[in-house]
Amino acid sequence: MPRTPKRVHQEAKEESAQADQPPKKSASEDVEAFTNKGFKNAIAATKAANAFPQGTARALYLSYPGYARVMEDLTQRVVALIGNVLHSKDIKGDIKKRQPEEQFEMVQECNDVLFERITTNLDIKGGLRRNTQQVVEAQVDVMSSSTSIEPAVASPQTQGTPKAGSWNRTTGTPQRSMVSARLFTAKNIVRPQTQFREPVDNSAQNPFVPRLKEKPNSLKPLALLPEYDDAGNVQSYLHPYEFELLKFQPPEEQFQKQKPVLPALMAETELMVVDTVEKLKQALEELRQAPQIAIDVEHHSYRTFMGITCLVQMSTRSKDYIFDTLILRDDMHILNLVLTDPKKLKILHGADLDIEWLQRDLSLYIVNMFDTHRAAKALNMARLSLAYLLKHYLDLDVDKSLQLADWRMRPLPQQLVDYARQDTHFLIYVYGRMTNDLLQQHAEPGLLGSVYQQSTDVCKKRYNKPHIGPESHLDLVRKTKRSFDNRQLYALRGIFEWRDATARSEDESYGYVLPNHMMLQIAESLPREMQGILACCNPIPPLVRQQLHTLHQIVLKARDQPLVKPILEAHSSTQAALPPSTKDFSSKLYCPHDFSQLEEIRDDLPTLLKRNSTTGKLEVPNKEEVAKVDPTLAAPAMALFEKQSKPTQEEEQRWAHLRKESQTMRMPYKRYLAILPLMVQLKADQLARERSELQKRQLCPAAPTVEQNIKLEAHAIGKEDDDMYSVPLKEQLKRKHPQANVKTDPEQQPTASKRPRKDENSQTKPPVKIEPVEKVQQALGESDDEVVEVPIERQATEPPKPSPAQNNRKQKKNQFQRGFKAKNRGNHPQSSSQQVPQHKGTGNFDYKNVDFRQFKGGAQRARGTEIKQQIRGKNRPNNRNNKQFNKLFTFSNVRKEGKK
């Protein structure tokens, strides 16, 4: 067995000893010296590793137990050291439990991380990351916020002094124009929110919690009191300075006339950029000496979900301050010592959003504020922007082309610094001028106090996180002129929820994740393939390309939905898009219904000028011709200011009759008599309609009338009656159809028809005689004292006398029926062609003498004949008969031969 070389064994021991010892710190900080030393160590380690036996020699050496044991110990130590390095570099996994291939992949991953970190550190050490960021500038055309008014030429006496603006200073018409806005940004800007000490919480479940730790200038101790919803969940928190704002009253000196002092030029004013804690404390001490402070905020909202406050500008009468809030985010709260002091006035312009941004990011609150935007609205100014106020009071044109700048750039370009300074540098002077204007409004003496009250209400605002509801996506549909079906709405809702979740998790805005117009395009087209989704986006957002599969699954689920609703409901119907307009509808001077400056001139009136047919020139006619021209128009049917024409004789008579009718009071009885003929006529018409309806509903034909029966021959009737009576009784009782015996009398034959017969003792009522209307009107024309009652006359008609032949027939019929009337009195046959016999000669029953007390139980309704089925057993002897009976009905037409 070959022995292990002593040199190799000693080198392995030295290498292991050096690995166990901690690395010595380099005395030189030079990058080149450190690199040379590292190369030497790497070369020595490579030589030592290459000195080990390889191939067949290594297999031969491993067969020796001592060599194999030493190599196993060294291998475990090296793997343990590599595992410690991987763990320190946040490489997940245990390298000791992996296979050799997996161990090699883990080492490669660690090398990549180390090389990237080394490259970054070398760039920082070499100063490559300290260079100024490359500024990208783009030009965009946007609508100007103010009117394009050319300044008038000032006189020598007024040059150099601020002039008050007026609506008639220039002859040009104020029109909004397109201005060029410059977009300032930089490439590869580091996201500031990644360097915050406290991570940003974008979740919708957790409400915004104020981060205020101490409460200076307080009347009530600091207490963050939550507000709960109906379900018992925390919805929001109360304002920390709500009690102080409720008790706040502006000092008396703020209601006195101010003495505005023109500020110095920005080039002559000191500027302090506060980006360290030491400078912040120094600025705080200087601000505590100033009675009035102008404040403005610069905000960024494109590459973050809730937004980031990037700059805060403050100005006093002698100095300007710019606070870098990205660096001093967690230390700016010490400025509450000044901002919450009720004795110091804070001046802002349009502070609705500034108040919320200061609360959310910097934990800053304001007490005693004057909002110049509210003051401009109280003064009914034509514009409410800060640029207009500077133009109005200072005749200063402010460049607003940098409103699209990216305020996250560090360091800030000088153009952005000057742009931020001008928002607060002149604001104190504007406050003084506006205060004097408000005090001069004698028509409304409390106007200044109302401005302070409105500004205090703005200070009470609290920040709330943005959230979406189940129908938030429908707001986008209502703003467009498109109509969506249920599939498209399903896709729109899914994409809308995906965008909200992605924006919160990635801390990006909705516009960066997926703009609204792209989202509507995807939901409307519902592309089948992934490339169709990308085709709807131009340019393609990075997060859309990254999560394309998720969006594709949402679209496919929407395509699988059944098409139920073709269009949107009426309450959520879309509105047509308004065409672009150059008019400023928010302007105080825009009065579309003010026509006082217009002259009412009609172009259809006759003219006195005539055109000569030969020369073609207009000529003035002579006076005689002018007199013939009648320029008056047709008289109106009704006029308010002109005297009406004299009415005609017919109109006077009609008006006199109407006045007499309105003045005459008629008695109620006369009114009754006047309406009586009309009511009788209406009742007769109703009876006629009912009679015609009954005739239409009659199923059986009507019986012949009495006159038709009288025309029959008497001898024929008598002979037929004798023949009928000679028939045996059994044949007479057989049922016959009423039309079988046409010659019989319907009055004497009870089974001939179902129509009931009239009572013989009852007489036909005479018809009502309607009095003519002329007679009633003559009676109404008399005086009210002489009431004349018009009686209703009835004409009595005699009943028709029966003929002798009819009397003989009745007598024979009555004599024939007396023989079996008593027998069949209680058992009348029920037939569809026979009537129930009725008794003659009985009059109406007299109920006057009836004692109804004996009928206490009341009457019961008669029940019909109940037919109960007999239930027979299976072994009954009559089952055979029942079967034959059923067979008889089933085969009733089959002749039975041979059976009796």
Swiss-Prot record:
The broad enzyme category this protein falls into is hydrolase
Keyword NAD assigned: no
Tell me yes or no: is Disulfide bond among this UniProt entry's keywords. no
User: Which terms in the GO cellular component ontology are assigned?
Assistant: cell cortex; centrosome; chromosome; midbody; nuclear exosome (RNase complex); nuclear lamina; nucleolus; nucleus
Disulfide linkages recorded for this protein, renumbered to the chain, are none
Start-end of Basic and acidic residues biased regions = 8-28
Q: In which tissues is it expressed?
A: Salivary gland (at protein level).
Q: What is its EC number?
A: 3.1.13.-
Residue ranges annotated as compositionally biased, kind Low complexity, are 878-887
Q: Which residues form the 3'-5' exonuclease domain?
A: 273-438
GO BP annotations listed: cell division; chromosome segregation; defense response to virus; DNA repair; exonucleolytic trimming to generate mature 3'-end of 5.8S rRNA from tricistronic rRNA transcript (SSU-rRNA, 5.8S rRNA, LSU-rRNA); histone mRNA catabolic process; mitotic cell cycle; nuclear polyadenylation-dependent antisense transcript catabolic process
Record keywords, A-Z: Cell cycle, Cell division, Chromosome, Cytoplasm, Cytoskeleton, DNA damage, DNA repair, Exonuclease, Exosome, Hydrolase, Magnesium, Metal-binding, Mitosis, Nuclease, Nucleus, RNA-binding, rRNA processing
Residue span(s) of domain HRDC: 485-565
This molecule's function is given as: Catalytic component of the RNA exosome complex which has 3'->5' exoribonuclease activity and participates in a multitude of cellular RNA processing and degradation events. Degrades a large variety of non-coding RNAs that are processed by the exosome, such as pre-rRNAs and some small nucleolar RNAs (snoRNAs). Degrades transcripts derived from different types of heterochromatic repeats, such as subtelomeric minisatellites and simple gagaa repeats. Degrades transcripts derived from transposons and transposon fragments.
Q: Give the family, as the similarity comment puts it.
A: Belongs to the exosome component 10/RRP6 family.
Quaternary structure annotation from Swiss-Prot or TrEMBL:
Component of the RNA exosome complex. Interacts with spn-A/Rad51; the interaction is required for the recruitment of spn-A to the DNA-damage response foci. Interacts with Su(var)3-9, a heterochromatin factor; the interaction promotes association of Rrp6 with a subset of genomic loci. Interacts with Su(var)205, a heterochromatin factor. Interacts with HDAC1, a heterochromatin factor.
Q: What else is known?
A: rRNA synthesized in the presence of 5-fluorouracil, a pyrimidine analog used in the treatment of solid tumors, is not efficiently degraded by Rrp6.
User: This chain belongs to which protein, by name?
Assistant: Exosome complex component 10 homolog
Q: Which organism is it from?
A: Drosophila melanogaster (Fruit fly)
